[in-house]
Amino acid sequence: MNTPAEIREILEKNQTFALFGHEYIDGDALWAILGLGRLLEKQWKTVSYFTPYEPSRVFSFLNWEKKVKTEFDYWKYDVLVFLDFNSYKRISAFTNGREEYFDPMQKVIIDHHKPELEPVNTAIYRDPEEISTCSLLYDLCSQWWPDLIDSEVATYLYMGLSTDSGNFRYDEGEQSVRVFQIAANLLKLWAQKKVIIDEIFRNKTYRSVQFMQLLLSRMQKVKFQLPFAEKETINLIYSFYEDTELEQYAVDHDEADYG
């Protein structure tokens, strides 16, 4: 793995960048590419943004379609940056059969997942202890370019942190302390928390409410025995849907996940 200083040197000495988010892109990956990309643009870099498939309608309030493309141009960029993933298979629509383009290129990976089949010619910085790639980016960029993190960038990074943590429900222990410290720092930089809460967690389409009604009608409660405690059981409530029902109700996977 490379040091933060080595990653910074690559980003600062080069001029043209292609930033990639993984297929079926989630909030953390989408806002990681937009956040880092904006910081590079502030340094007069030329940045292009790519992901294999259109992001969810949940994220449409960002007007991402003005920047993020779903077809890759295979131009000779100085650096390809993979954010929130670490193998070609996560952007297979771009990489399958095109390894002769990707392999020789200088690449950077910034990620919070455990390593998979990482490509050659790649500088890598990862921390699996981080709850999101956006929180990892904040840690790096607040050291590298603190004066460039404005309200727009802070909002992107806060959105990635918020969505990957389940709106701060998934973190525990020391990680929880760190997550809230980062969130507080981003709010001090004028991250637009209300926009995030309203647009992602509160606003619902009529179709998504109908879909939620379907899930509630299928809700079941069962007793579940914990594998590590033979005599201890918990009540588990679950529901389910089929992919064909997403089409029927005209909702996508992220709309279903965010309820």
Which residues does each PLM region occupy?
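Short alpha-helices
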Residues: 112-182
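Hydrophobic helix-and-loop "lid/oligomerization" segment in the mid-to-C-terminal part
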Residues: 2-23, 29-58, 76-77, 165-259
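An acidic intrinsically disordered interaction segment
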Residues: 1-5, 97-107, 128-137
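Hydrophobic/aromatic residues located in beta-strands of well-ordered beta-sheets
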Residues: 47-49, 107, 157
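Active-site cofactor/cluster-binding pocket
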Residues: 63-65, 69-123
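Short glycine/serine/threonine/alanine-rich loop segments
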Residues: 45, 105, 146
